[in-house]
């Protein structure tokens, strides 16, 4: 197994693992963390350059392997007549070379395919994270509304209690005012001149 084939197979495995993790139904926090890490990595110019160069090399390997796998294998036969007959066979080395090129073509093709699938899946994950964040904010607002309503109810209860106390104090104040008026009326009647003379005459008679 050559070095570049090992590298290609490792790259394909990494892409498959990444795509498998991205499509898993993960919790919101983990998915948001993965998306943030992916954005931070892909935003760097060095990472973009590495991805571009790797994509170009894999694309060239795919084209070369495809061309080599399409080459027709020459036929030969075992006799020395030099003519091609029904006993013609295909060389084992040519078949092995074709299989080797086809294998490289499939691996490089899948690498290119997954390199397109990963950004597409991440765009979907981006929308999922965005909408899930909006849903969570709406749920928090709904949870905060009852507390505000309870505060409003408590304020209304306090206001009602204060109004009731104020009404009672007004009633007691009105009662005191009536008592004061009655006392003033009583003293006014007692202090009139006729009433004073009658009171003095009754005292002298006694």
Swiss-Prot record:
Source species, domain of life: Eukaryota
Keyword Oxidoreductase attached: no
Ranges for region Disordered: 140-163
Xref: Pfam families: Bap31
Cytoplasmic side of membrane: 29-45, 126-206
All ranges on the Lumenal side of the membrane: 1-7, 67-104
Renumbered ranges of motif Di-lysine motif: 203-206
GO annotations of cellular component type: endoplasmic reticulum; endoplasmic reticulum membrane
Ranges of Basic and acidic residues composition bias in the record: 150-163
GO BP of this protein: endoplasmic reticulum to Golgi vesicle-mediated transport; intracellular protein transport; protein localization to endoplasmic reticulum exit site
Compartments, record wording: Endoplasmic reticulum membrane
Cystine pairings recorded for this chain: none
Cross-link (Glycyl lysine isopeptide (Lys-Gly) (interchain with G-Cter in ubiquitin)): 190
Keywords: Endoplasmic reticulum, ER-Golgi transport, Isopeptide bond, Membrane, Protein transport, Transmembrane, Transmembrane helix, Transport, Ubl conjugation
Membrane topology: Multi-pass membrane protein
Residue spans crossing the bilayer: 8-28, 46-66, 105-125
Function statement: May play a role in anterograde transport of membrane proteins from the endoplasmic reticulum to the Golgi.
Record remark: domains: The di-lysine motif confers endoplasmic reticulum localization for type I membrane proteins.
Other information: Present with 7210 molecules/cell in log phase SD medium.
Family per record: Belongs to the BCAP29/BCAP31 family.
Official protein name in the record: Endoplasmic reticulum transmembrane protein 1
Organism: Saccharomyces cerevisiae (strain ATCC 204508 / S288c)
Organism taxonomic ancestry: Eukaryota, Fungi, Dikarya, Ascomycota, Saccharomycotina
Encoding gene, per UniProt annotation: YET1
């Amino acid at each position: 197994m050559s070095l570049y084939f090992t590298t290609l197979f490792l790259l394909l495995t990494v892409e498959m693992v990444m795509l498998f993790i991205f499509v898993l139904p993960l919790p919101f926090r983990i998915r948001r963390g993965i998306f943030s890490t992916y954005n931070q990595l892909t935003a760097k110019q060095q990472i973009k350059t590495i991805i571009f160069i790797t994509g170009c090399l894999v694309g060239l390997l795919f084209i070369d392997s495809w061309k080599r796998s399409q080459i027709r294998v020459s036929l030969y036969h075992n006799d020395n007549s030099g003519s091609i007959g029904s006993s013609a066979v295909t060389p084992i080395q040519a078949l092995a070379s074709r299989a080797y090129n086809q294998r490289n073509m499939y691996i490089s093709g899948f690498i290119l395919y997954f390199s397109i699938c990963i950004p597409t899946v991440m765009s979907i994950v981006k929308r999922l994270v965005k909408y899930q964040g909006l849903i969570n904010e709406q749920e928090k607002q709904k949870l905060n509304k009852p507390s505000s309503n309870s505060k409003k109810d408590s304020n209304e209860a306090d206001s009602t209690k204060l109004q009731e106390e104020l009404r009672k104090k007004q009633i007691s104040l009105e009662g005191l005012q009536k008592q004061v008026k009655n006392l003033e009326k009583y003293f006014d009647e007692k202090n009139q001149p006729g009433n004073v003379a009658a009171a003095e005459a009754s005292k002298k008679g006694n």
